[in-house]
Amino acid sequence: MNQSYRKRLESYVKKTYHVEAEQLPFNNEDYAVLRHAESGKWFAVFIVKARREFGLAGDGNTEVVSLKIRDRMLSDMLMKQPGYLRGYPSSKWNWTTIVLDGTVPFEDICKWLDESYDATKSKTKNKKVPLQKRRT
């Protein structure tokens, strides 16, 4: 693999959702957010921190991505698998952090990225229009 997971994920999001990573509000290249173009809501946060800050063994830094998972039971199940951590920096149950070191396959991370994108869509976009209100 020539590119880092982060670069590959950024390319995937740009191609799939036409969204580019932003350093705002951090002004630090170690951090970036992915957000919906329409609403500005975040659906992913890339973070580089010392391994110990994530409760991981070893020295040095590691890169992670935090994503929103709608299903609490699923989120709890993921926490029991290697490469998944409780949400960082938000410890709310619906944010899950994935270590970008190859432990979690790239395809799985893309699946969770898609889930996070859907979970953070604007509520008005997600609402189903009742049949009688639809135009015919």
Residue ranges and their predicted role:
Residues 1-136:
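Charge-dense, helix-prone N-terminal extensions
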